[in-house]
């Protein structure tokens, strides 16, 4: 019982990270109907920017954890947002009216470019970092097994829920959110009605990239190690989470992330850890067969 509870806590934490990344996927898809396959690598870039910022602040003598994290969050999210804007301008906007596969191929090219840029500039070796938020709460101790809830896990869960609440409010209550929903329903009609669709799409990429950077910072603080390849695996799993939860739905993205995180962690705990990725990706196949619109997704209505 205690062991299962610990895995539940670990799975929820990992799922929240996947959910943060998945929100970026689902926002972009909801507006332009395309998957940003460079999004996972922006998450990776955000993790490296966070590491660079934390090391730089430490070298300047700024070691107060709250201040260092706040400055790092602004730095990483700001630069990652710039990367997201660049991806939209370079890989998507020029090819928006082209055949459907053109932006996809272009985004994959941007993904490979980001991976190789980080590999060349930061090296291929794993980058470690010591824990900034140690300690936690011991929930129970049974059969010589202590169930621990770390402060970092609590921070990840709270951050994800706050982000979900803020962006749900953004999409439903603000002029930008109304523009996003109008573009999602009919991009050309939104443009005819006076909405700056190019600006709305660019801001969507910028917001999604900033969220990916937040997830990158959470990943760095939680696991303490990163490399240039983490964006690919995490990105594919977050995409799986977005599809499972219902792509286009913000709560669905987080719900899908939770399910993928729980499946991965429980599989690693009770079965062979070598097949945890197989188990996670198998869920995508099952979801596409039996629930093609996802758990909270809406069936598309084809206009005639």
Locate predicted features:
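Membrane-interfacial amphipathic/re-entrant helices at transmembrane-helix boundaries
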Residues: 1-22, 49, 60-72, 98-102, ...
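Inter-helical junctions in multi-pass inner-membrane proteins, predominant
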Residues: 1-17, 170-177, 201-242, 265-278
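Single transmembrane alpha-helix segments in multi-pass membrane proteins
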Residues: 4-55, 86-102, 244-250
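Glycine-rich helix-loop "coupling/hinge" segments at transmembrane-helix boundaries
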Residues: 40-42, 223-250, 256, 280, ...
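Transmembrane helix-bundle core of multi-pass membrane transporters
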Residues: 94-95, 103-173, 200, 266-271, ...
């Amino acid at each position: 019982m205690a062991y299962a509870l610990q895995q539940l806590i670990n799975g929820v934490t990992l799922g929240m990270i996947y959910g943060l990344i998945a929100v970026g996927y689902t926002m972009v898809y909801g507006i332009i109907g395309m998957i940003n396959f460079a999004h996972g690598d922006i998450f990776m870039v955000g993790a490296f920017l966070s590491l660079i910022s934390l090391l730089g602040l430490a070298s300047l003598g700024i070691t107060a954890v709250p201040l260092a994290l706040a400055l790092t969050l602004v730095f990483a999210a700001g630069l990652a947002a710039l990367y997201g804007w660049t991806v939209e301008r370079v890989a998507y906007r020029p090819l928006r009216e082209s055949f459907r596969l053109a932006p996809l191929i272009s985004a994959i090219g941007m993904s490979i470019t980001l991976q190789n840029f980080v590999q060349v500039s930061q090296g291929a070796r794993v980058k470690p970092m010591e824990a900034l938020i140690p300690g936690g709460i011991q929930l129970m101790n049974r059969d010589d097994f202590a169930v621990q809830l770390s402060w970092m896990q609590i921070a990840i869960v709270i951050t994800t829920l706050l982000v979900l609440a803020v962006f749900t409010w953004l999409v439903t209550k603000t002029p930008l959110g109304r523009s996003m929903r109008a573009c999602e329903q009919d991009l050309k009609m939104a443009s005819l009605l006076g909405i700056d669709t190019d600006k709305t799409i660019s801001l969507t990429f910028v917001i999604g990239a900033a969220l990916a950077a937040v997830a990158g910072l959470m990943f760095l603080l939680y696991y303490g190690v990163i490399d240039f390849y983490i964006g690919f695996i995490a990105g594919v799993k977050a995409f799986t989470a977005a599809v499972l939860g219902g792509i286009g739905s913000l709560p669905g993205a987080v719900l899908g992330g939770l399910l993928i995180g729980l499946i991965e962690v429980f599989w690693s705990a009770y079965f062979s850890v070598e097949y945890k990725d197989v188990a996670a990706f198998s869920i995508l196949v099952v979801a596409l067969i039996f629930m093609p619109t996802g758990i909270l997704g809406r069936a598309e209505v084809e206009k005639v």
